[in-house]
Design a protein with these regions (language model features):
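Short acidic-hydrophobic surface loop/beta-edge motif
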Residues: 27-34, 270-283
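Active-site recognition of the HExxH zinc-binding catalytic motif
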Residues: 64-76
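Active-site-adjacent "gating/activation" loops or surface patches in catalytic cores
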Residues: 32-47, 283-291, 299-303, 342
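Short pre-active-site segment immediately N-terminal to the catalytic Zn-binding motif
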Residues: 55-65
Length: 525
């Protein structure tokens, strides 16, 4: 038994595997916390910019955006740190190099990083208390503030019943972007039977159907140690961090009675090739857009997913790339882009048009098929493929995404680990993948992949966003509906709404208690 295995065992962790990985300039250790069921990956190297993240598998089961609202809400105070905005306080007092949280279509991630070990322990403490012991159970106003609530605005005949809330307003903005609406339409067409048919961020129509009880129930079911993926990164004291995790959170949580894990399903979609999907949207005619999508395979097929990304760059990465050139010359849109959507169970390739002309969706399908056939039969420009391969390798090696390496690598690891425990570190390795693909360039591999993706693929879809009316007309129709809803309220209902808003404003404006602020950890000067 190695020293690390002994340390792990002393804190309730079972060492599963240790593997040197040159791409992370260190060793990846996989562990399992027996009592709680938590998974843990320790990426051990000499990086002084240390990182911690905890991720939960949170597949959406509807369009209410419950996990997006939870991501916001758990960071509004917790049992141990009952302050309203710990984020704001930590940004002032911590040496953090990264402090954020993210909602994905099927997971919610809470990463932090710091160059100071004590600071990282402090940040970890705040985050773990937030996700496992949030104030949402004793302060319903958090749900109203971050999720949604109703308000009465205006006076007399102009009075309107409106919905407000941080996530609600955020998604109204996000889904006023045609590209976002197009992606959602394409994803729903490709995956009609799985979580990816839903907008995990929430839609303005569905968010107000989420109840406070449903909000809490989703937290109880998904924010559990046996649904958690913990990643430690950098040059840090394993004994200290594993001990902290075990003694402060995992062991106490394991001691509490709980039922079997019951999270929303995250299944695989059987191949589908539905009729083209048209999504009406109140937007200007020049915002019309269209896309075709082709499922590449499963996330575990690492080399195939990387190869598809290289292929898309080769044929769509620049204006002179073959498929993009043909699409632009056809005059069916102002611009064309291609990319691979990963960090999902079944990654897919997308060719998308912006500023699409009428009939562009049909033309897009025909042009993609014809050009793919020409390239598959006549051969790709091998120099173009090699250049795309070298660029992809450079991007992976440099990891220059504006985040600390520990955060980037945690996100990379979760792009594969979430879907399979067989090889959690698969998405951290890339040298062998690129070496293999470099050999295959001359063997016709990319031409074969082109044929498999675009010509012989029985899992594909097409979607378009069709402008229906001006933004102004849509806004006036919405306002008219809000005025009508306000007029239909009884006096008691209106009074109840006003009182709830008054209580919310009072809670928002009340300062944190000095004793609560003092509980937040700070580095000694």
């Amino acid at each position: 038994m190695t020293d690390l295995e002994q340390v792990a065992a002393s804190h309730g962790f079972t060492a599963v595997k240790s593997e040197p990985i040159s791409e992370v300039e260190g060793t990846v250790h996989l562990m399992h916390h027996a009592a709680s069921g938590a998974r843990l990956m320790f990426i051990e190297n000499d990086d002084a910019n240390k990182a911690f993240s905890i991720t939960f598998k949170t597949p959406a089961a509807d369009d209410t955006g419950v996990f997006h609202i939870l991501e916001h809400s758990v960071l509004c105070g917790s049992e141990k740190f009952p302050v309203k905005e710990p984020f704001v306080n930590l940004l002032k007092t911590s040496m953090q190099t990264f402090l954020n949280a993210m909602t994905f279509p099927d997971k919610t991630m809470y990463p932090v990083a710091s160059t100071n070990e004590q600071d990282l322990v402090n940040l970890m403490d705040v985050y773990l208390d937030a996700v496992f012991h949030p104030d949402i159970y004793r302060r319903p106003v958090i749900f109203q503030q971050e999720g949604w609530h109703r308000e009465l605005e205006g006076e007399g005949e102009g009075e309107r019943l409106v919905v407000n809330g941080v996530v609600y307003n955020e998604m109204k903005g996000a889904l006023s972007e045609p590209d976002s609406v197009l992606y959602d339409g394409l994803s729903a067409a490709l995956f009609p039977d799985t979580t990816y048919r839903f907008e995990s961020g929430g839609t303005p129509a569905a968010i107000p159907t989420l109840t406070y009880e449903g909000f809490l129930e989703n937290h109880r079911r998904h924010y559990r140690p046996d649904n958690a993926y913990i990643i430690l990164y950098g040059n840090l004291d394993a004994d200290r961090f594993l001990g902290f995790l075990d003694e402060r959170y995992l062991a106490p949580l394991a001691a509490k009675e709980r039922g079997p894990l019951d999270i929303n399903p995250l299944g695989l979609q059987a191949p589908v090739a539905p009729a083209p999907v048209s999504v009406p949207m109140a937007t200007a005619p020049e915002n019309a857009c269209a896309a075709v999508g082709f499922v590449i395979g499963r996330a575990a097929e690492r080399e195939r997913v990387v190869a598809a990304d290289i292929l898309m760059d080769a044929i769509m990465g620049a204006n002179e790339s073959p498929l993009k050139r043909v699409l632009l010359d056809a005059g069916i849109a102002d611009d064309a882009i291609g990319y691979v959507a990963d960090s999902v169970a079944q990654p897919f390739a997308v060719v998308s048009l912006r500023g699409a002309r009428p009939g562009a969706a049909d033309a897009l399908r025909a042009i993609v098929e014809a050009e793919a056939r020409r390239l598959a039969e006549g051969g790709l420009d091998r120099e173009l493929v090699r250049a795309a391969l070298s660029h992809a390798e450079f991007v992976m090696r440099e990891r220059n995404f504006g985040y600390p390496d520990g955060v980037v690598l945690a996100m990379s690891a979760m792009a594969g680990w979430l879907y399979s425990d067989d090889d959690p570190a698969a998405y951290l390795r890339f040298e062998d993948v690129f070496a293999s693909l470099r050999e295959k360039v001359e063997e016709g591999y990319f031409e074969a992949l082109l044929r498999e993706l675009f010509l012989d693929n029985d899992h594909r879809a097409c979607a378009e966003v069709v402008p229906t009316e001006s933004d102004e007309a849509a806004e006036e129709a919405e306002a008219a509906g809000e005025r009508e809803a306000a007029a239909e309220l009884t006096e008691d209902e209106a009074a109840s709404i006003r009182e709830a808003v008054r209580a919310l404003r009072e809670a928002q404006e009340a300062p944190d208690a000095p004793e609560a602020l003092e509980k937040l950890p700070q580095l000694s000067r």
